[in-house]
């Protein structure tokens, strides 16, 4: 390659080659990687080689790699071994090309499965198989010669298959014989490497090898298909592993799923790439530990200090920084995925002098990059874990350590591999001492697609002696895995202020009441850490008055990118605050949101944080973040305050009081029994009267929907589409369960004192029935903190262990996903005794619920109706017969004459009904109870028609399951016959026959079928309204964008995608109200 005219460019070095084959004769087919390294090492940080007619560039310095990792200039390409593996796994995550659609779909579906919470959830399965390995070595005895890579291959393959697919290879129960899948996989990887090193014409002559390759591929895919078929046949499974995500998951962006072939592609990708690299890491780690006895002893001491002799638990893993550094240093010296290949779509210059032509493969050889002496020093080839400890690792230049690849195409399973490796090495160091079977062994490398030690053997001896049976009992013991609580915890009486507690201010911005409930939970926790909440208030209450004498904690959410109603004034004030005007304010922000609203996710919390900084306020803890799509908000708040807030503002020499759960056992909320009192309510709520309550569905319907008609008091008004806030009452069944658990009668009088952060009237008597019905969320899933309190109160060690597991490893599956409440746990463990005040302190305050009003004030200005789905479904927690929605069951149980406490709230933004119905065509799209606001719109249209207004056309697209839940059918038919509206329906679970304007399918299908109607209205200037679930709204939006796109003249939009083109209409002609 000749340098271009630019005088600063130099030619990239290259070795001498032969005609036709170039440098191909230098490559050893048994060791292609290291023969390549040997060839290019003398050529410097960059070189070029030709293999036949193909030009390749290779880099070996961190300085050049740092430029290559810029994804705006260079992207991963699939060549060499990966290209050959496409015959086996096609466009799986590892081998897909950047532009392939299946990669995008699979990546978005699988990212949540490999999140931190999900990986922690897999810990029990990982530990199960690690124990099988340990038992094998214990049973074979200290003279048994261990084939290290073979046993680690068994372990990592079994672990990956069990954790991600619920399939057991049972590799430790088949003697020395590996599962046939392993033989097929090893041959396939080797064949892919050989094919990549040979020209295509030579590969075409290797008929026997090709037939073996085809046979192995067919066997592995058949095994995966069998696993899929078995899972599909298990209709009662509630698994949430990788296979479940592949089978049931839908792309959150497009709504698409994956075919069986694509699922098999990704199953094989994870089984092949995932277990091979991790088994290599474990093998190399054991080699380096044995070759460096002092390092092994230091790692073992760390494991012993953290575990304190108890079995390794998931919470131990984050407390092993030195062992983590051992694994990082192992991957630096021996990256088991030894490189990746990039290219650029256009000519690029790197290092200021090397021209990289467009579309030329650039190989990154990590075994050379990771030994760059300019970064790692003259001892770069030595094994020194200290250089990988956090304080040193964080000082490395960017992109100095890349064993998991780069950027968007980096390894999705990094967290899985890290947890697995940490667990296994920690258990091995805790259980055994080791020695090399051959003391003179020198490291040799075996290459396939990955690298592993070749012929590495060792011996293992139980550290504490005894028999394998003794060791098995030890492994399976139920020793405590958490911090040990004192049997006589110190108890402090609650204080609302003064004394030795310091004040803080808690402010919240929330429309739905979630951040408000979080604020009161935070206030309750504050008393455990030396603080009391002097003020708990909406953000608007702090406009112009942020205190400078105490910490301020702000909890906020975004609503279509805007602040909540009770934060608007504060937000506007903050936007105009002058520089340094808030100097002296000490604050931190916790943001709530949902990732499906990508464009505005966490926007308001981030802006509040930035604006406070700009005005001179000082952040005492980094902003907390909770994503309700994948997180429990109460759990994330608990984590954030425990890890960041309380340590930052603690009053005692910067040390956090960690005995909060112990204190809660004795209860900070003191309860006395006295006389009843009159109900006190939220000041902004008014008393309304139920006029009618009726079912909208037949007894044959799946799920129940209700219509509730409410008489509003004088002076309360609303507009079509506005919301009604409702103060609910807990279902009597749940209240009775609490009374039974604490042996109380419904009319027992209670009086609470001592903790004003718990949102109930203090020093006021009321019946316990009233207290439980009106003030607390009884069905809220328990948080890990709640469960730890129960564990601290438990006297039985086995019960403590079970609860500690529920608070950690199995929390997501057994608590959050099953909606297991604190009450459920107290019923499950009746032997646990906690004070009634403790129970109340742990519960969140009862929240207001928000409903769309389903009527127009033109129909009756003093009446408002609600249309709602009643949540009453089988409980997933054993012992709890039903899971009941709090507000929906309360409303469904009301009868004419019942009183209810409500408040109207204006709808914000562009969801307001058009002001002039004679000029603005309207398109309404709804599913189920999402019809509510549009019934109000239609009533308003009918009223105006009756008063002589010539209505612009309007259409309603409505989806439901069947004719049994076709809401307001006769009413809508009457409106349609009078020309108020055109209605197009979709039944998802009933054949429609010849019914007019009705389709089998979902509301999206009806919209697609009637696209001409939509386009005609759109071209006439229609505004589109959508109301329903997140999934429905997302799919409808994509469809609407495509319909609008195709309706526009091609020369106007040809440079844009449908979604890009549609953005120009989102703030003026498209409005969505989404219920989660």
UniProtKB/Swiss-Prot annotation:
| Needed cofactors | FAD; FMN; heme
Q: What class of enzyme is it?
A: oxidoreductase
| Residues noted as binding FMN in the record, renumbered to the chain | 510-514, 589-621
Q: Name one Pfam family in it.
A: p450
Q: Which PROSITE patterns match?
A: CYTOCHROME_P450, FAD_FR, FLAVODOXIN_LIKE
Record keyword Electron transport present: yes
What CDD domains does the entry give?
bifunctional_CYPOR, CYP120A1
EC id = 1.14.14.1, 1.6.2.4
What name goes with this protein?
Self-sufficient cytochrome P450 monooxygenase CYP505P1
Species this chain originates from: Hypocrea virens (strain Gv29-8 / FGSC 10586)
């Amino acid at each position: 390659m000749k340098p271009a005219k630019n005088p600063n460019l130099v030619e990239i070095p290259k070795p001498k080659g032969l005609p036709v084959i170039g440098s191909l004769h230098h490559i050893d087919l048994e060791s292609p990687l290291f023969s390549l390294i040997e060839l290019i090492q003398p050529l410097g940080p960059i070189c070029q080689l030709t293999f036949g007619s193909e030009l390749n560039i290779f880099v070996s310095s961190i300085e050049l790699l740092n430029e290559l990792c810029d994804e705006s200039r260079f992207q991963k390409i699939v060549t060499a071994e990966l290209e050959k593996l496409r015959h086996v796994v096609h466009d799986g995550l590892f081998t897909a090309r950047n532009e392939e659609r299946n990669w995008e779909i699979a990546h978005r579906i699988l990212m949540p499965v490999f999140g931190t919470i999900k990986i922690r959830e897999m810990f029990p399965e990982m530990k199960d198989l690690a124990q099988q390995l340990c038992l094998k070595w214990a049973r074979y005895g200290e003279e048994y010669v261990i084939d290290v890579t073979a046993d680690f291959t068994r372990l990592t393959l079994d672990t990956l298959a069990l954790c991600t697919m619920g399939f057991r290879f049972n590799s430790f129960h088949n003697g020395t014989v590996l599962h046939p899948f392993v033989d097929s996989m090893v041959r396939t990887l080797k064949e892919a490497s050989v094919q990549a090193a040979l020209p295509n014409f030579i590969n075409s002559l290797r008929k026997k090898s090709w037939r073996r390759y085809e046979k192995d591929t067919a066997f592995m895919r058949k095994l995966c298909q069998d696993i899929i078929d078995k899972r599909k046949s298990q209709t009662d499974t509630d698994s949430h592993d990788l296979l479940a995500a592949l089978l049931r998951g839908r792309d959150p962006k497009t709504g698409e799923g994956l075919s069986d072939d694509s699922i098999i592609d990704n199953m094989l990708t994870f089984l092949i790439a995932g277990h091979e690299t991790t088994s290599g890491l474990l093998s190399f780690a054991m080699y380096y530990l044995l070759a460096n006895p002092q390092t092994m002893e230091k790692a073992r001491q760390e494991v012993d200090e953290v575990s304190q002799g108890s079995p390794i638990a998931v919470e131990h893993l984050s407390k092993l920084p030195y062992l983590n550094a051992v694994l990082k240093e192992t991957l630096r010296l021996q990256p088991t995925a030894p490189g990746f290949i990039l290219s650029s779509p256009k000519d690029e210059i790197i290092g200021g002098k090397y021209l990289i032509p467009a579309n030329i493969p650039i190989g990154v050889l990590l075994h050379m990059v990771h030994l760059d002496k300019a970064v790692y020093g003259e001892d770069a080839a030595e094994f020194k874990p200290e250089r990988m400890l956090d304080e040193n690792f964080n000082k490395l230049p960017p992109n100095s350590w890349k064993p998991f690849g780069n950027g968007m195409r980096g390894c999705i399973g990094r967290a899985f591999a890290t947890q697995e490796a940490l667990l296994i090495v920690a258990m091995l160091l805790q259980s055994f001492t080791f020695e090399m079977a051959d003391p003179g062994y020198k490291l040799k490398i075996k290459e396939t697609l990955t690298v592993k030690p070749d012929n590495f053997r060792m011996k293992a001896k139980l550290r504490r002696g005894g028999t394998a049976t003794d060791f098995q009992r030890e492994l399976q013991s139920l020793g405590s895995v958490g911090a040990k609580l004192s049997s006589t915890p110190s108890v402090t009486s609650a204080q609302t202020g003064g004394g030795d507690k310091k004040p803080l201010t808690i402010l919240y911005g929330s429309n739905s009441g979630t951040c408000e409930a979080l604020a009161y939970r935070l206030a309750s926790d504050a008393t455990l850490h030396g603080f009391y909440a002097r003020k708990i208030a909406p953000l608007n209450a702090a406009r112009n008055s942020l205190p400078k004498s105490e910490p301020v904690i702000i909890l906020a959410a975004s609503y279509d990118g805007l602040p909540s109603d009770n934060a608007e004034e504060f937000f506007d004030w903050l936007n105009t605050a002058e520089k340094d005007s808030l100097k002296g304010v000490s604050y931190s922000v916790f943001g709530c949101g949902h990732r499906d609203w990508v464009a505005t996710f966490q926007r308001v919390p981030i802006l509040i944080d930035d604006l406070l900084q700009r005005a001179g306020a000082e952040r005492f803890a980094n902003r907390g973040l909770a994503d309700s799509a994948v997180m429990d908000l109460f759990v994330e708040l608990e984590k954030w305050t425990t890890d960041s807030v309380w340590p930052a503002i603690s009053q005692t020499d910067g040390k956090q009081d960690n005995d909060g759960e112990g204190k809660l056992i004795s209860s900070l909320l003191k309860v006395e029994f006295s006389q009843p009192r009159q109900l006190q309510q939220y000041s902004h709520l008014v008393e309304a009267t139920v006029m009618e309550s009726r079912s909208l569905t037949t007894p044959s319907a799946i799920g129940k929907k209700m219509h509730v008609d409410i008489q509003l008091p004088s002076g309360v008004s609303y507009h079509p589409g506005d919301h009604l806030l409702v103060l609910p009452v807990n279902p009597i069944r749940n209240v009775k369960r609490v009374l039974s658990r604490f042996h109380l009668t419904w009319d027992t009088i209670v009086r609470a004192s001592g903790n004003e952060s718990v949102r109930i009237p203090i020093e006021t008597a009321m019946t316990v029935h009233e207290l439980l019905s009106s003030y607390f969320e009884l069905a809220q899933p328990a948080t890990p903190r709640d469960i730890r309190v129960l564990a601290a109160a438990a006297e039985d060690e086995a019960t403590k262990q079970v609860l500690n597991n529920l608070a950690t490893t199995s929390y997501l599956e057994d608590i959050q996903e099953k909606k297991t409440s604190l009450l459920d746990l107290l019923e499950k463990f009746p032997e646990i005794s906690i004070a009634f005040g403790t129970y109340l302190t742990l519960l969140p305050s009862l929240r207001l619920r928000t409903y769309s009003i389903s009527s127009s004030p033109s129909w009756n200005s003093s009446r408002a109706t609600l249309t709602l789905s009643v949540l009453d479904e089988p409980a997933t927690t054993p012992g709890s017969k039903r899971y009941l929605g709090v507000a929906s069951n309360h409303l469904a149980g009301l009868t004419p004459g019942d009183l209810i406490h409500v408040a109207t709230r204006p709808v914000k933004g562009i969801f307001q009904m058009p002001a002039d119905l004679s000029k603005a065509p309207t398109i309404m799209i709804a599913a189920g109870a999402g019809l509510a606001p549009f019934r109000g719109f239609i009533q308003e249209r009918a009223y105006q028609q009756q008063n002589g207004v010539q209505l612009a056309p309007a259409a309603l697209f409505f989806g439901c399951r069947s004719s049994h839940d076709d809401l307001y059918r006769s009413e809508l038919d009457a409106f349609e016959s009078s020309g108020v509206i055109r209605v197009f329906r979709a039944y998802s679970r009933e054949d429609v026959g010849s019914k007019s304007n009705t389709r089998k399918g979902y509301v999206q299908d009806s919209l697609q079928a009637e696209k001409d109607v939509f386009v005609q209205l759109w071209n006439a200037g229609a505004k589109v309204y959508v109301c329903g679930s997140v999934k429905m709204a997302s799919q409808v939006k994509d469809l609407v964008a495509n319909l609008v796109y195709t309706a526009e003249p091609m020369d106007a939009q040809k440079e844009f995608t449908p979604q890009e083109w549609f953005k120009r209409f989102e703030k003026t002609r498209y409005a969505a109200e989404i219920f989660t």
